[in-house]
A protein has these predicted regions:
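Short loop/edge segments at beta-strand edges and connector loops
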Residues: 5
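Acidic, low-complexity, intrinsically disordered interaction modules
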Residues: 15-73
Length: 73
């Protein structure tokens, strides 16, 4: 499965009313550039996960990426 843009993920989320947004993993990855730096990268294929997208967050250590998923579970 590949990381897609947030817009594409929200489109999938709206198409499946039973889906919800959930963190894909608990890791934090240092922010590099923009979301396009992460779009297209391969991630583990997990049953029930419809899409994965990158989201920018910030804490006291600086900006980081959090991978979010659209899931049916």
């Amino acid at each position: 499965m590949k990381i897609i843009t947030r817009g594409e993920a929200m489109r999938i989320h709206r198409q499946h009313p039973a889906s919800r947004l959930f963190p894909f993993c608990t890791g934090k990855y240092r922010w590099h550039g923009g979301t396009e730096a992460y779009t297209g990268r391969e991630v583990q294929d997990i049953p029930g996960v419809l899409a994965v997208f990158a989201e920018r967050h910030k804490d006291s250590f600086g900006p980081y990426v959090r991978l979010m998923s659209v899931t049916l579970n």
